């Protein structure tokens, strides 16, 4: 696959992962694969320890066999995405382009920019960013997927 140049990921509403113009969400291994991919997307600024991924995917009371399930899941993610994009064994890092667009992050940024503009009395400047936040926030987060960290 090589290095990716652009990615657009939609976590609110219908789950979409468009990387370099190709939809890759169907290459992810089932619901659990989508949950893990989404978690890694939102935490891509740093490597994520395997124990943290276990908690994210299965919760505090995860049975011992989930360690093997996590290894299998990560192997399938590497196969679908390309091993060069999912780095590490004890700490896992998803490598996405710096310009990656994630709708949930755009909503948070829009809300922050709107609040800052309002605080400075620039009401008109708040309109666009507030609209982005509103339109993303009206869609459910990770529709149809379940994990301890999804609320």
PLM region spans:
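Residue-level signal for inorganic ion chemistry
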Residues: 53, 77, 133
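A short, compositionally biased
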Residues: 9-15, 80-81
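Short acidic, hydrophobic short linear motifs in intrinsically disordered regions
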Residues: 47-56
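C-terminal flanking helix
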Residues: 71-74, 78-82
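Intrinsically disordered, charged and Pro/Gly-enriched terminal/linker segments
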Residues: 1-3, 25-31, 39-45, 58-68, ...
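A structural micro-motif at secondary-structure boundaries
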Residues: 12-34
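Long, low-complexity, charged/polar intrinsically disordered regions in eukaryotic proteins
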Residues: 2-10
């Amino acid at each position: 696959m090589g290095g990716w140049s652009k990615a657009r990921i939609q976590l609110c509403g219908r789950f979409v992962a468009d990387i370099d113009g190709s939809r890759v969400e169907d290459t992810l291994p089932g619901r659990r694969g989508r949950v893990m991919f989404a978690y890694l997307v939102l935490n891509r600024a740093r490597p994520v320890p395997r124990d943290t991924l276990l908690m994210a995917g299965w919760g505090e009371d995860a049975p011992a066999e989930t360690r093997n399930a996590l290894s299998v899941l990560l192997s399938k993610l590497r196969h679908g995405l390309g091993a060069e994009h999912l780095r590490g064994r004890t700490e896992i890092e998803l490598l996405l382009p710096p310009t990656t667009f994630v709708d949930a992050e755009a909503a948070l940024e829009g809300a922050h920019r709107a609040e800052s503009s309002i605080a400075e009395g620039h009401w008109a400047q708040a309109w666009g960013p507030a609209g982005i936040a509103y339109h993303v926030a009206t869609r459910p987060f990770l529709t149809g997927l379940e994990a301890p960290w999804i609320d």
